[in-house]
From Swiss-Prot:
Its EC number is 2.7.7.8. Signal peptide: none annotated. The lineage of its organism: Bacteria, Pseudomonadati, Campylobacterota, Epsilonproteobacteria, Campylobacterales. CDD domains: KH-I_PNPase, RNase_PH_PNPase_2. It catalyses: RNA(n+1) + phosphate = RNA(n) + a ribonucleoside 5'-diphosphate. PANTHER family: POLYRIBONUCLEOTIDE NUCLEOTIDYLTRANSFERASE, POLYRIBONUCLEOTIDE NUCLEOTIDYLTRANSFERASE 1, MITOCHONDRIAL. It comes from Campylobacter jejuni subsp. jejuni serotype O:23/36 (strain 81-176). It holds the Pfam family KH_1. It is found in: Cytoplasm. Keywords: Cytoplasm, Magnesium, Metal-binding, Nucleotidyltransferase, RNA-binding, Transferase. Mg(2+) binds at residues 507, 513. This is Polyribonucleotide nucleotidyltransferase. Belongs to the polyribonucleotide nucleotidyltransferase family.
Length: 719
């Protein structure tokens, strides 16, 4: 059976009862030329442990884009970082809606079978998974709906396609059910339209770099406005899915685990051990608190009166009493376990460049959370190559953030393994927060590594703070300092409290984890996960403005620390950027790369060449070696006559500024398109002026000459 739904600017087509009919729920969803299959399967036997055994997998099939997987193994293997992060978004959006007491191992699988480059696969996949889950026999009150909000020319855009998102200064992803928000991910996108590199003279020795990059932070009011638009769209989508599919939902015969109450144990602990529990909560550090609570449990179990009680029942009841005391103290007294007020940030200490051989480092400590963040600068060959499903060629990632969370940071003796979903998610959040502050034209590849040495809440936000200062310590010209703070929420009987800079105890026993990062001028990234099943706009507004206070407090401390930074110039890599005649690049390379290999070995440098623009980048550890390599290359290009047979300069004497032509696109390069004007003469249409167009070779375009300089012509599109 097929349903076509016009919703939130998109036409969504769902096939139900067509494929994967042995799954508990399955749907084949089509949007544009994209097709995804979402399935839900569950086991019949419940787990004994007290947790939700939910697994989400998101798989992009290479054939969906007409590709064969690269590498030696020609099949899909372990998920990419992008797939893992999308699976995490789906998990975080759907998990809050599972009913209390649900304990059946459940797997949600979303497979991309056909990929349309214009379609937002993240939003589509969440909505497909939501409908599949709603159709199953798992009790869900209503379908979840996901939307994305962009901002183009100052206007918020609902569900921008991938092309529109390229021109957006905002990427806001929101999931919810009815009028409740469940999950938020937001990042500011720096405006790159005005960033250009100018060549001052023909094949100049130095490329002059100018930037007017805007970080495009959002104010708290702008975020609330965007969330309001998202909330209306989510209500629309959730209602539409419910109306279309409620009659096809399977009847639920699932038994939910009843929470086992032990009133006699609860009364005994509250009457005899409440004071000791409160002292353990309020007067001890994280590790000591856990140890003391275990001692209390053992003391209870050793009493004659408790000999018939199981250890599990005592521990579970003790945890309930602890949770109740923490929450009551916050709501009734406005006091937190470590004595702080609700909006108080823990003490902060900062040390920079403590690693003498690293390019830049920062040890950032906030309370019992400590991050050592290290910045490393590299050349073009150090960039991370990422193969995206909807891109023809791998893209180069110039700014990387790696987050590591060893067991010793929380006092555990666990093996150090490859990064899991949590590590990837925290690193991605820190990257999204810091990326707008880094100049797009900065010539080095940047890698930040965050080693969490101690953790008691907010380690991802410590990574943001330490990362911003590590960039400064490495001499990276970041536009502004960026700080992050994690907010929490306690909600009980129509009373609520918003907490600034939550620690692990408040995260575990609280109702929300809301991370906000940005500069003094606004927010660059935020992430919210809710345990309540939804949050209203007023509470969200309070959390945003309280986060702003905390962020500015942290930034003031960071600014003082930044003044004390002494950049270690000796260990930083050196870079020379200059230009040659593009036709001479082949001479620098030499036959089978012989010449460039000789230069690299002789001078101990790395060299990156841009064949289209004639740019040459030389990186090394010593200025003398770089200068010698540059002189050697200049000598090669000036002594050679060029090896391009039949190439000659075109006569441009008959061309003038403002002239208009109906040109033909002859060649497309990463930086723009070459448009033939007349008599074989080309003009360059820069990529920043044609981002909204999907150009192809031999396409006809009406253009006008905007600049004639150094024998080269630049053109603009005619309006």
């Amino acid at each position: 059976m097929q349903y076509s739904i016009e919703i939130n600017k998109n036409t969504e087509i769902f096939d139900i009862d067509k494929v994967a009919k042995q799954a508990a729920g399955a749907v084949l969803m089509r949007q544009g030329k994209s097709i995804v299959l979402a399935t839900v399967a569950r086991e019949e036997k419940q787990v004994e442990e007290d947790f939700l055994p939910l697994t989400v997998q998101y798989i992009e099939k290479a054939y969906a884009a007409g590709k064969i997987p690269g590498g030696y193994v020609k099949r899909e293997t372990k998920p990419s970082d992008a797939e893992t992060l999308t699976a995490r978004i789906i998990d975080r959006s759907l998990r809050p809606l599972f009913p209390k007491g649900y304990a059946y191992p459940t797997q949600i699988v979303v497979m991309v079978l056909s990929a349309d480059p214009k379609v937002d696969l993240q939003v589509m996949s969440l909505n497909a998974a939501s409908v599949a889950l709603y159709l199953s026999d798992i009790p869900m009150k209503a379908p979840v709906c996901g939307v994305r909000i962009g901002k183009i020319d100052g206007n918020f855009i609902l569900n921008p396609n991938n092309e529109e998102l390229q021109n957006s200064t905002l990427d806001l992803y929101v999931a919810g059910v009815k009028d409740e928000l469940l999950m938020i991910e937001m990042r500011a996108l720096p405006d790159q339209k005005e960033n250009e590199i100018f060549i001052e003279a023909p094949y100049a020795d130095v490329l002059t770099q100018t930037t007017s990059q805007n970080m495009n932070e959002l104010s708290e009011d702008e975020i609330l406005e965007a969330l309001n638009l998202a909330q209306k769209a989510i209500l629309n989508g959730s209602n539409a899915y419910e109306e279309a599919f409620s009659k096809h939902k399977k009847n639920s015969q699932i038994e939910l685990k009843n929470e086992i109450e032990h009133p006699e144990i609860l009364a005994f602990i509250e009457n005899n051990f409440q004071k000791q529990i409160k002292e353990a909560i309020n007067q001890m550090a994280k590790s000591e608190r856990a140890s003391e609570l275990n001692k209390i449990a053992k003391e209870i179990l050793n009493l004659e009166i408790t000999k018939d009680w199981s250890e599990e029942s005592v521990l579970n009841t003790l945890a309930k009493v602890k949770r109740k005391l923490i929450r009551e103290q916050i709501l009734n007294e406005g006091k937190r376990a470590d004595g702080r007020s609700l909006n108080e940030v823990r003490p902060i200490s900062i040390e920079t460049n403590i690693l003498p051989n690293a390019h830049g480092s920062c040890l950032f400590t906030r309370g019992q959370t400590q991050a050592l963040v290290v910045a490393t600068l590299g050349g073009e060959n150090d960039a991370q190559m990422i193969d995206l499903l909807t891109e023809k060629n791998p893209i180069s990632e110039r700014f990387m953030v790696n987050y590591n969370f060893p067991g010793f940071s929380v006092g555990e003796a666990s093996p150090i393994k490859a990064p899991g979903r949590r590590e990837l998610g925290h690193g991605n959040l820190a990257k999204r927060a810091l990326y707008p502050s880094v100049d797009e034209n900065y010539p080095y590849i940047i890698r930040l590594v965050s080693e969490i040495l101690e953790s008691n809440g907010s380690s991802s936000m410590a990574t943001v703070c330490g990362g911003s200062l590590a960039l400064k310590a490495a001499g990276v010209p970041s536009l502004k300092l960026v700080a992050g703070v994690a907010m929490g929420l306690i909600f009980e009987d129509n009373k609520h409290a918003v907490l600034t800079d939550i620690m692990g105890l408040e995260d575990h026993d609280g109702d929300m984890d809301f991370k906000v990062a940005g500069s003094k001028d606004g927010v660059t990234a935020l992430q919210m996960d809710i345990k309540l099943g939804g949050i209203d706009q007023e509470t969200l507004k309070q959390a945003l403005y309280q986060a702003k206070e905390g962020r500015i407090h942290i930034l003031n401390i960071m600014e003082e620390a930044a003044k004390e930074i002494i950049v270690n110039e000796e260990v930083l890599p050196k870079l020379e950027l200059f230009s040659v005649d593009p036709s001479k690049i082949v001479d620098i390379i030499g036959q089978a790369g012989k010449t460039i290999k000789e230069i690299i070995e002789k001078f101990g440098v790395s060299i990156d060449l841009d064949r289209e623009k004639g740019e040459v980048k030389i990186a090394g550890s010593q200025n003398e070696q770089i200068k010698a390599a540059k002189d050697y290359i200049i000598n090669i290009t000036s002594s050679q006559k060029g090896t391009k047979k039949g190439s000659k300069d075109k006569d441009i004497s008959g061309f003038e500024l403002g002239q208009e032509f109906q040109g033909i696109v002859k060649k497309i390069a990463p930086f723009g398109a070459f448009v033939e004007l007349k008599n074989g003469v080309d003009g360059l249409l820069h990529s920043s002026k044609s981002k909204h167009l999907n150009l192809s070779e031999n396409q006809s375009l009406k253009v006008k000459i905007s600049e004639i300089k150094n024998g080269k012509i630049s053109v603009d599109l005619c309006e």
